[in-house]
Amino acid sequence: MKFLELNKKRHAIKTFNDQPVDYEDLRTAIEIATLAPSANNIQPWKFVVVQEKKAELAKGLPLANKVQVEQAQYVVALFSDTDLALRSRKIARIGVKSLPDDLIGYYMETLPPRFAAFNEVQTGEYLAINAGIVAMNLVLSLTDQKIASNIILGFDKSTTNGILDIDPRFRPELLITVGYSDEKPEPSYRLPVDEVIERR
C-alpha cells in the first residue's frame, strides 16, 4: 500500500466485530513497528499483548474505552523501559555478534552515564516521544494488513503493571486496541497544511 493511501485508510476504530485476529499477523505488525526510529537507537519499548486479561484491564476505564478493550481481539499495552542505562547495555549484549566494536563501546560506556544524568522530566519526555513514534508505526502496520486499531491514552497507569504482572521499571504509555471492524469511518477533519507551517 502506498504511504499516502495507508495514512488515509488509518482511522481510530472504536468498535470491533467477532472476527479473530491471527496472533502471527499481530506479531508481524509489531515486528514491523520496531523498525521505527528511536533516539540513540535505544528502542526503549516493550509490547505486552493482552487477551486473557482484557477484562481486568477494562475495569475502571471510561465507558467508551472499556467497551473497546472488551470488544477488541487483542490489546497491546505499550511500556517504556525507564532504566535506559540498563537498556543500552542490553543492546550491546544482545547485539555483540552484529555490532562493530565502536558501537558496543557506545552502548556500554558512552550512553549509560549520559542517561544517568537525565532528570525525571528529561527521562519522561525521552520515553514519551519514542513511544509515540513506535505506536504510530504499529497502527500503520496494522492498517496495512487491514486490521483496525485505536490508541487509548485514558487508562489508570498506576494499576497496569500489577494487572499484567510487569516489572515496575517499565512505564505504561498507552493501549492499542486491535481487531476487525464493520465501522465505515469518515475521514477526520485536518487543518489546511499552511495553517501548521511557518517559514523563516
From Swiss-Prot:
Cofactor: FMN
GO MF terms held by the record: oxidoreductase activity
Record-linked SUPFAM superfamilies: FMN-dependent nitroreductase-like
Protein name, entry field: Putative NAD(P)H nitroreductase Spy0809
Pfam families given in the database record: Nitroreductase
Top-level taxonomic group: Bacteria
Family: Belongs to the nitroreductase family.
Keyword Oxidoreductase: yes
Keywords for this protein: Flavoprotein, FMN, NAD, NADP, Oxidoreductase
N-terminal signal peptide: none
Coiled coil segments of this chain: none
Gene3D superfamilies with a match to the protein in the record: NADH Oxidase
Annotated EC: 1.-.-.-
